[in-house]
Amino acid sequence: MKKPIIEFHNVSKKFGNKLPINNVSFTVKKNNITTLIGPNGAGKTTIVRLMLGLEKPTSGEIIIDPRLKIGYVPQKFNLSSDLPITVKKFLDLLAPNNLTNDIKEIHSFIDLERLKDQKISTLSGGQFQKIVLASSLLSKPDLIILDEPLQSLDVTSQQEFYQLISLIRKKLDITVFMISHDLFTVIKNSDQVICLNGHICCTGTPNAITPNSDFSNALSSLGFYTHHHDHKH
């Protein structure tokens, strides 16, 4: 059985009079893809900040192995599109030259050889997101946190991105924690789905999202229309 690498136990966080998350409990298991979904203002960013150690819980307990190396890909990667820098230069700035064979294979998968001489500003959204993801792997993290990685990507780019995530998990034995608002892509590609709206509404495997299940009803109440999923299966 896969062991948890992060555990939240009855965690609440207050900012002044605001309580973005209240009594939240969940675990992230090693080598799983766990996706956190929820509407805007649900507390997803607060969860990430707590996981990264940027905030401390007001109450409750968070258990994270202090040796755990965490990589983070923010929703908006602050890199000026006017920057006259090539993909290769960008990655060289972030990485030592002694890349492992596994990371070289991932670079091959994102077609780095073809892209390396392109300016960052000329990349498509999907290409740029894959380059940012590759750069986050250079520190060889145990866990990678992806904040809305699929936003503004077309369907083809989303599929390619998930293929890359699957390869990364397999080759590098990395655990993936992803924030998303796209339920249908999540259903196909996650081991665990956590639905958050200030508190945990439901959690389980994508298989638990069946017609009229508690999971499905909770998602529907937050505006996630699960009948599309029923249609496909």
Swiss-Prot record:
- Show the Pfam families listed in the entry: ABC_tran (PF00005)
Q: What is its EC number?
A: 7.2.2.20
**Which GO cellular component terms, listed alphabetically, does the Swiss-Prot or TrEMBL entry include?**
plasma membrane
Instruction: Give the way it sits in the membrane.
Output: Peripheral membrane protein
Q: Where in the cell is it found?
A: Cell inner membrane
Question: Which parts of the sequence bind ATP?
Answer: 38-45
> Quick check: keyword Repeat in the entry?
no
- According to its UniProt record, this protein's enzyme class is translocase
SMART domains hit by this protein: AAA (SM00382)
Please, one GO biological process term? response to zinc ion
Entry GO MF terms: ABC-type zinc transporter activity; ATP binding; ATP hydrolysis activity
Query: Has UniProt tagged this entry with the keyword Secreted?
Result: no
Q: Which reaction is recorded as catalysed by this protein?
A: Zn(2+)(out) + ATP(in) + H2O(in) = Zn(2+)(in) + ADP(in) + phosphate(in) + H(+)(in)
Per UniProt, residues of the ABC transporter domain are 6-222
Q: Which UniProt keywords apply?
A: ATP-binding, Cell inner membrane, Cell membrane, Ion transport, Membrane, Nucleotide-binding, Translocase, Transport, Zinc, Zinc transport
Biological function: Part of the ABC transporter complex ZnuABC involved in zinc import. Responsible for energy coupling to the transport system.
Q: Which family does it belong to?
A: Belongs to the ABC transporter superfamily. Zinc importer (TC 3.A.1.15.5) family.
Q: How does it assemble?
A: The complex is composed of two ATP-binding proteins (ZnuC), two transmembrane proteins (ZnuB) and a solute-binding protein (ZnuA).
Q: What is this protein called?
A: Zinc import ATP-binding protein ZnuC
